[in-house]
Design a protein with these regions (language model features):
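Surface-exposed loop/turn motifs in large extracellular/passenger domains
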Residues: 38, 58-64, 80, 100-107, ...
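Residues in short coils/turns that link rungs of repeat/solenoid architectures in beta-rich domains
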Residues: 81, 100, 160, 195-201
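Parallel beta-helix/beta-solenoid
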Residues: 37, 60, 69, 79, ...
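Acidic/polar low-complexity surface segments
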Residues: 98-100, 158-182, 269-274
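Short, Lys/Arg-enriched N-terminal segments with co-localized hydrophobic residues
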Residues: 3-18
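Acidic glycine/aspartate-rich repeat arrays in secreted/surface proteins
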Residues: 162-167, 264-317
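Short beta-strand elements of solenoid repeat domains
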Residues: 22-24, 33, 41-45, 50-52, ...
Length: 317
C-alpha cells in the first residue's frame, strides 16, 4: 500500500483476511498500528511518526520497520525476528514486551541523532550508532552498542521490575558488561556513562575515558579509573573512587567515603544535608593541596537569614 503526498495518515491494520503487507507512509506525521495476522514492512519516510507493533499472540514479530527521518516513536510488544531502523532524528524506541519468541531476537538500529531506548525485553541487539544515545534496561541479557557519540546505560527501570527490583547491578564499562543481582549479563560496547538503580547496592566502574557514573539510591561503590570523571553517589552511604584524572566527586546524601585519586579533583557539596555531623559525616581521605584539589561549597547557603541557597562571594573575585 502506498500513501504519499498527503498531510498525514493514521492507519490501523485490521485483523481481517485481506490486508496490506507493505506500508509506505508520507513525509508528514504518520500513525501506523499493526493489528493484522501477518508480518509487515513499514517505510514511514520523513516526519515525526508513531509506529506500534502491538500483536501479542502467535502472529506477532518478524516485522521490518524503516522509520525514516524525523523524531519518531516506535513501540514494540512482541519480541522476535523484528528488524527496526529508527533513522535520522531524536527517536524513541520502547520494547514493552508482553510476548517473545525464545528462538529469535530483535535488532534495532538508532541511526543518527540522540536516541532513547527503553528496553523491557530479553536477549536482543540494540545499536545507537551516531549521536548521544541512552539505553534503559531491566537487565535481561541484551546487547547494547552505543556507536559514536557519548552514550549512556541506565538500570533505573529495574526499580519498577519485580524480578530484579532491589537486587542492584554491577556495571563495568572498561570490560564492557553489566550483571544483575540474579546473574543475568548484558554486553555494553562503546558506552561512556552509566546509571545504577534506586533501591539496590550497585557496583559501577568506568573506563580509561571520561565517564559520568551515577549510583542513585542504595549503598553504591563507584570507581572512575582513568579520564576526567564525574561520580555521583546519590542517596545512601556510598564509596567513590576517582582514580587518575581531574575528577568531580559528589557523595550526595548519606555517609559517603570519597577518594579522589591522582589529579586535580573537586569534592562537590550542594546542600548541607549531604554531610551530617559526628560519625555520619562524609570522609575525604586524600585531599592534596599539591595536586590543587578543591572542596566546592559554592552552591551551599551562605546566608541562613535569607530563604533559599545563596552562593558564597569571595574577596578578589
Amino acid at each position: 500500500m502506498l500513501i504519499d503526498d498527503q498531510p498525514e495518515i493514521s492507519m490501523v491494520l485490521p485483523k481481517g483476511r485481506a490486508m496490506a503487507t507493505r506500508i509506505y507512509g508520507t513525509n508528514y506525521a504518520d500513525i501506523i498500528k499493526q493489528n493484522g495476522y501477518i508480518a509487515i514492512e513499514i517505510y514511514a519516510y520523513d516526519g515525526d511518526d508513531d509506529i506500534y507493533l502491538n500483536r501479542t499472540d502467535s502472529y506477532g514479530g518478524y516485522n521490518f520497520v524503516d522509520a525514516g527521518y524525523g523524531n519518531d516513536l516506535v513501540v514494540n510488544s512482541y519480541e522476535g525476528g523484528n528488524d527496526i531502523y529508527l533513522g535520522g532524528g531524536n527517536d524513541i524506541y520502547v520494547a514493552d514486551i508482553r510476548v517473545r519468541d525464545a528462538s529469535s531476537y530483535d535488532i534495532v538500529y538508532g541511526g543518527s541523532g540522540n536516541d532513547r531506548f527503553e528496553i523491557e525485553g530479553y536477549a536482543s541487539d540494540y545499536y545507537g550508532e551516531s549521536g548521544n544515545d541512552t539505553f534503559f534496561s531491566v537487565g535481561f541479557n541484551n546487547y547494547f552498542n552505543g556507536g559514536t557519540g557519548t552514550d549512556t546505560i541506565s538500570y533505573q527501570f529495574q526499580d519498577d521490575w519485580s524480578a530484579e527490583r532491589g537486587k542492584g547491578v554491577t556495571i563495568d564499562l572498561g570490560y564492557n558488561y553489566a550483571t544483575t543481582g540474579s546473574g543475568r549479563r548484558e554486553d555494553l560496547i562503546s558506552i561512556e556513562n552509566a546509571t545504577g538503580t534506586n533501591y539496590g547496592h550497585d557496583d559501577i566502574t568506568g573506563s580509561a575515558v571520561a565517564n559520568t557514573l551515577r549510583g542513585l539510591g542504595g549503598h553504591d561503590i563507584i570507581e572512575g579509573l582513568g579520564g576526567n570523571d564525574v561520580l555521583d553517589g546519590g542517596s545512601g552511604d556510598d564509596d567513590l573512587y576517582g582514580g587518575s584524572g581531574a575528577d568531580i566527586l559528589r557523595g550526595g546524601t548519606g555517609f559517603d567515603y570519597l577518594v579522589g585519586g591522582t589529579g586535580t579533583d573537586s569534592f562537590d557539596f550542594n546542600s548541607i544535608s549531604e554531610s551530617a555531623v559526628g560519625s555520619r559525616r562524609d570522609v575525604i581521605t586524600d585531599f592534596h593541596r599539591s595536586e590543587f584539589d578543591v572542596i566546592d561549597l559554592s552552591t551551599i547557603d551562605a546566608d541562613t537569614t535569607w530563604s533559599g541557597n545563596q552562593s558564597f562571594t569571595y574577596i578578589g573575585g
